[in-house]
């Protein structure tokens, strides 16, 4: 058996680990759709319900050139699957950059050990392999020091939240229910959401209108001026009005509004005349009121019963009349008795 001369190549360990050769990512060849391999046409975006006011897609996912397509005739570039022209399909350039990767969330900070708990320690093997007393001293110091809670990771999570708008073909397939549904939602930062609305705390409260207060003297002076002007402002009276307004202490516009509002109260307009006529008519229709000068005589007292007979209750006059009649009859009987004798 022949001896073989074998040479071993020494291995090199940079930084204590073997570096693996990075393999380049395989690039898939782009599929050309009648454009000479330069561009790729994806899903069909033609709206088949545009005449009805809606939005409907045919579902074609990629442009496939028909056998009768001629690059020299642009009108013949139609899809063999859906029959639509190539311009209705979404154009995707070959050298378009890949979409950005999703943001990586930061790992949560490790929780510090509580007092009285033992944590596993990862120790690297030393030269000697023995342990010194300094490790135990350090562990006692770790147990005795105060434990502070970790900071909340809310700020880091909010800072890494990035909004990626949807692709145009996805926005077109949402339907024609409204423009508000096609627009991407706005992302508001926590600071902007917590900030109060501009304009103070009033918000939508309407502003209260300022009302001018007049004193009794100002009202009297304005009434005198209005009566002098005939409750009308004319151009020839501007100098007088300006002078009186300076003396009274009110503006010309304020005096004009006051005169217009109180014209019917002091002048007696149509409403005042109507109320006066109605009150006079009511007074004329009412009968005159004459209070009695002397009280009426009292009614006679009711009769009182003085005797009782078989016929009922008799008054004193009736009893007297009956007694008189009885006496007369007795005298007649006495006078007739001697004659008969």
From Swiss-Prot:
Keyword list (alphabetical) reads:
DNA-binding, Homeobox, Metal-binding, Nucleus, Transcription, Transcription regulation, Zinc, Zinc-finger
The subcellular localization recorded is:
Nucleus
Instruction: Please report the name of this protein according to its UniProt entry.
Output: Zinc-finger homeodomain protein 9
Q: Taxonomic classification, please?
A: Eukaryota, Viridiplantae, Streptophyta, Embryophyta, Tracheophyta
GO MF, any single term: DNA-binding transcription factor activity
Q: Which gene encodes it?
A: ZHD9
Superkingdom as given in the UniProt entry? Eukaryota
What binding partners and quaternary form does the record give? Answer: Homo- and heterodimer with other ZFHD proteins.
One GO BP annotation here? Answer: regulation of DNA-templated transcription
